[in-house]
Regions:
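N-terminal maturation segment of proteins
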Residues: 1-531
């Protein structure tokens, strides 16, 4: 099956980057940032000349999705987005640290790619300094963001004992691979230290700058509109989207009150919502006694949905999802990468049982694991979109959030977890737009968010600065989920009707697509989108 197309062949040939999406690595990320100007020139030639002859090109007419991507990327805002998007939350150092801090990744092919191209790590400080020190972007940042750079540029290495414990390689190979690990680690640490010096130097400029409003607001509304479309693959009325977010939040609060009273008789209908959240969070039945109990709980839920979706409903399974338990204070709580669902237990005492079903449905089956492996095994029809751009986030993360509502035989506590996660994604819409489009401050948004979430205050602050540094991305979950709801009509969902699941399977095979084309394909009336 053809896993590529003309445009991807041109780009990978000229930029000398990996063409197999399974082998994309941080090295390709570095090459992409470094060669951005060359990339734009390639797209420009491809855009204006249907007969563009290239050594790797088989001359075919461009399709509508390719045209949309190329025209969108050639807008001047895309270059600004590359520079501002390479920040403390999203940068090559973080990508490398994920590999070097995780013993499970050292035997993966991407580690070999990193070792082979290890000298390219020396280019990261120059590339990153250029991105964050542009004088026109000074007000995009504040001292807090620069300090957060320093907090993530760190290097807690793993030991040979930790690696040996999980490796499937022979003893001799383990010794050889770990020698390579030490070589890469030394280069990585040296460059982290060099970049930290640059950050500290630049941070001094913010000492006397009391910049409370950060983000796109300083650059302009047109730029934020571009960022939002870059993650959704569709242009929406931002003020309508914000209004809908507030309406959805009220609906979810009302629903949470109903289910909270079902699980705790001491909760009353007129109780302050923050007190309800405290009672739910501190309910002893939802706490774990040990990491072992937590691990078994997750494994059982993964097994449950594997039996339902793979064995009973005949969803495709190309690989079984692996649950990888690890502990690292600098990495996120849970995420999926190719075949692995990584679960960070660093803060396990604050993790709750009622969130497990939603997280498993989102990250594994029928969520990201099912969607990604279906995509890889059936051939990505528009691989260049998946490879270089965020424009598929609406589809991919929307499918993940939509999957959270596809549970079976759930308890009231499971429903509470689903409501909490949907409320969380709804708040993202409100906060992201308020920060970047209406000039609200992170402090204002913190005071707003904390009244609706079970997470601790430091995690909420981390979330807000994530939105500052990656405008539009956080909106993609809820908007994408709404598209799938409109297609499948979740309000009339019948869990025993196999036709519903046949449509789910078809949607996975159709994608991933920018939401604009998914909406057109299924004839969704955009005027009724926010109802």
């Amino acid at each position: 099956m053809n896993n590529t197309n003309d445009l991807l062949k041109i780009i990978t040939h000229d930029l000398k980057i990996e063409s197999d999406v399974k082998l994309i690595s941080t090295i390709d990320e570095i090459k992409y940032i470094k060669q951005w100007d060359k990339y734009i020139k390639l797209l420009g030639k491809y855009s204006i000349n249907d007969a563009y002859i290239h050594p790797s090109r088989v001359n075919k007419p461009k399709n509508d999705i390719e045209k949309y991507l190329v025209e969108f990327t050639l807008k001047p805002e895309s270059t600004i987005q590359l520079e501002l998007g390479t920040n403390y939350y999203n940068n090559p150092f973080s990508s490398i640290y994920f590999i070097l801090s995780n013993p499970f990744t050292i035997d993966n092919p991407v580690f070999n790619v990193l070792y082979k191209n290890r000298n390219m790590i020396n280019q990261i400080p120059i590339l990153l300094t250029k991105c964050f020190s542009h004088p026109e972007y000074f007000n995009y940042y504040n001292e807090e963001i620069l300090n957060r750079w320093l907090s993530v540029i760190q290097y807690k290495p793993i030991s040979f004992k930790e690696y040996k414990k999980v490796s499937q390689k022979s003893d001799d190979k383990q010794i050889l691979i770990f020698k390579k690990y030490k070589i890469i680690l030394k280069i990585f640490i040296d460059n982290c230290n060099e970049f930290s010096k640059e950050i500290k130097k630049y941070a001094k400029k913010y000492k006397n700058n009391d910049n409370k409003i950060v983000g796109c607001y300083h650059i302009g509304k047109t730029y934020y509109e571009h960022c939002l479309e870059s993650h959704l693959g569709i242009k929406l009325d931002i003020n309508k989207l914000l209004k809908w977010g507030h309406i959805e939040l009220k609906r979810l609060v009302k629903k949470m009150r109903v289910y909270a009273q079902k699980v705790d008789s001491t909760i009353k209908s007129d109780m302050d919502f923050t007190k309800i959240l405290d009672k739910l969070k501190n309910n002893p039945t939802q706490k774990y006694k040990s990491i072992k109990e937590l691990e078994e709980y997750y494994k059982n839920v993964i097994k449950k949905y594997s039996n339902i979706y793979i064995k009973k409903l005949k969803f495709p399974e190309y690989e079984k999802p692996n649950l990888v338990i690890f502990s690292n204070s600098k990495l996120g709580g849970g995420y999926y990468t190719l075949n692995n669902f990584y679960l960070n237990t660093f803060n396990w005492k604050n993790m709750r049982k009622f969130t497990v079903e939603s997280l498993v449905l989102h990250e594994t089956i029928p969520g990201h694991h099912t969607q990604v492996h279906t995509m890889l095994n059936h051939g990505i029809r528009y691989p260049v979109l998946f490879y270089f751009h965020s424009i598929l986030n609406g589809f991919i993360e929307g499918w993940g959030l939509f999957s959270e509502q596809l549970g079976f035989n759930q308890t009231d506590w499971d429903i509470i977890g689903q409501i909490e996660y949907e409320m969380y994604r709804t708040l993202r819409i409100i906060v992201d737009i308020s920060l970047h489009y209406h000039g609200k401050t992170p402090d204002e948004m913190f005071n707003f968010m904390k009244d609706y979430l079970l997470m601790d205050h430091e995690s909420i602050k981390n979330e807000i600065y994530r939105y500052v540094c990656n405008p539009g991305q956080a909106v993609s979950y809820k908007v994408g989920s709404q598209v799938f709801k409109k297609i499948i009509n979740i309000n009339n969902w019948d869990t025993i009707n196999n036709k519903n699941y046949e449509l789910c399977n078809k949607l996975i095979l159709d994608g991933p697509l920018p939401l604009k084309f998914l909406i057109e394909k299924y004839k969704i009336n955009i005027n009724n989108f926010f109802t």
